[in-house]
Amino acid sequence: NAGAIQPQWQSPVVGDKVRFGPAPFPYQLIRAIDPGRTLVLGSAPGESRTPASWVFHLEPVAGGTRLIVRSRNGYPPGIGQTIVWRVMTDPIFFVMERRMLIGIRDRAEAYAAALAAVPRGA
């Protein structure tokens, strides 16, 4: 997670890699994008043994914007895989995703406050 909005990351295109940490951390590819509204990430060929997607969607609501996040994972069959993924990995992912969303909220609110502080016409 970045601590601030990074200008160099504001023009993503389909096919770009979104890495989950510094290399060699795994990554997903941008599969679809509607700028300013929706970003769809998906498993990269050879990068993951299970198909997965992660969608970020902005929905205007009264007085602001709601960020809707959905993820889907194709877990391998078997009791051992179920224990590893659903019992161990999913709760860890929940905590990490929640921290990421809180960071996004904090940066968005700080950015909105900074914009509001700029005099009109400046």
Model regions: which residues?
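Active-site rim elements
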Residues: 87-91
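Glycine-rich portal/gate segments that line the openings of hydrophobic small-molecule binding cavities
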Residues: 1-68, 73-81, 85, 98-118
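Short terminal or interdomain "cap/linker" segment that borders an active site or interface and mediates
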Residues: 121
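Aromatic-acidic/polar surface patches that form glycan- and anion
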Residues: 93, 97
